[in-house]
UniProtKB/Swiss-Prot annotation:
It comes from the Bacteria. Pfam families: RecR_C, RecR_HhH, RecR_ZnF, Toprim_4. This is Recombination protein RecR. One of its GO terms (biological process) is DNA repair. Disulfide bonds: none annotated. Coiled coil: none annotated. GO terms for molecular function: DNA binding; zinc ion binding. The keyword Zinc-finger applies. The lineage of its organism: Bacteria, Bacillati, Bacillota, Bacilli, Lactobacillales. A zinc finger (C4-type) spans 57-72. May play a role in DNA repair. It seems to be involved in an RecBC-independent recombinational process of DNA repair. It may act with RecF and RecO. Belongs to the RecR family. The gene is recR. Keywords: DNA damage, DNA recombination, DNA repair, Metal-binding, Zinc, Zinc-finger.
Length: 198
C-alpha cells in the first residue's frame, strides 16, 4: 500500500533502527502520528538532545554526558582490573549486577575477519595506552560468545600476555551466540565469578 510521502518517510526512518522491520516501523509511524503535538515535540527534543549532549568517554569509550565518565572518575573503583566490552550497552548490563568494581573499556565493535574489520578498526589502541602505567594486572574480556567475540578475545590475549597482564574471559554461563546486554543478572554474575584465564 502506498502511504502519503510524510508517513512513508517516517516509516523509512523507523525501519533503519536495528531490529525494526517494515511492519513494526509502520506501527511506530502511525502511533507517532496519533500522538499529541506536545508529545511529538518532547520526543523530538529528547532525541535531538541525546544526540547533541552524549559523547564517548575519552578514557574508556563509554557513552556519557560528562567527559571523562562517572565510572572513570570514581577513584573508589578497583584500579587493577579493566573489563573489556563490545559496546556501551554491555557496561550498563555489567553495572546492574553490582558485583564488578573495576573499570571498563568499550571497543565499539569486534574484530571480524569475514567482514573486513581488523584490530585497527575498533577501540584497541587506547586500551593498550591505558595499560602502560602498570596499575592494571588483569583484563577481563567480556565480548559476546560468537566467532567475532572469540577472535577479539584471542587477539587481546595475544597482545597483552607478553606484557605480563593476566587476561581472563567470562565463564560460559553465557550461551554461545548470545548477547551480554540480554543476559539476566544471575547469568552475568556467574559468568564474571567463574571467568577463565586465556
Amino acid at each position: 500500500m502506498l502511504y502519503p510521502t510524510p508517513i512513508a518517510k517516517l516509516i523509512d526512518s523507523y525501519s533503519k533502527l536495528p531490529g525494526i522491520g517494515i511492519k513494526t516501523a509502520t506501527r511506530l509511524a502511525f502511533y507517532t502520528i496519533g500522538m499529541s503535538n506536545e508529545d511529538v515535540n518532547d520526543f523530538a527534543k529528547n532525541l535531538l538532545a541525546a544526540k547533541r549532549e552524549l559523547t564517548y568517554c575519552s578514557i574508556c569509550g563509554n557513552l556519557t554526558d560528562d567527559d571523562p565518565c562517572h565510572i572513570c572518575t570514581d577513584t573508589s573503583r578497583d584500579q587493577t582490573t579493566i573489563l573489556v566490552v563490545e559496546d556501551a550497552k554491555d557496561v550498563s548490563a555489567m553495572e546492574k549486577i553490582q558485583e564488578y568494581h573495576g573499570y571498563y573499556h568499550v571497543l565499539h565493535g569486534l574484530i571480524s575477519p569475514m567482514n573486513g574489520v581488523g584490530p585497527d578498526d575498533i577501540n584497541l589502541k587506547s586500551l593498550i595506552t591505558r595499560l602502560m602505567d602498570g596499575k592494571v594486572s588483569e583484563v577481563i574480556v567480556a565480548t559476546n560468545a560468537t566467532a567475532d567475540g572469540e577472535a577479539t578475545s584471542m587477539y587481546i590475549s595475544r597482545v597483552l600476555k607478553p606484557a605480563g597482564i593476566k587476561v581472563t574471559r567470562l565463564a560460559r554461563g553465557l550461551a554461545v551466540g548470545s548477547d551480554i546486554e540480554y543476559a539476566d543478572e544471575v547469568t552475568l554474575l556467574r559468568a564474571i565469578e567463574n571467568r577463565t584465564e586465556l
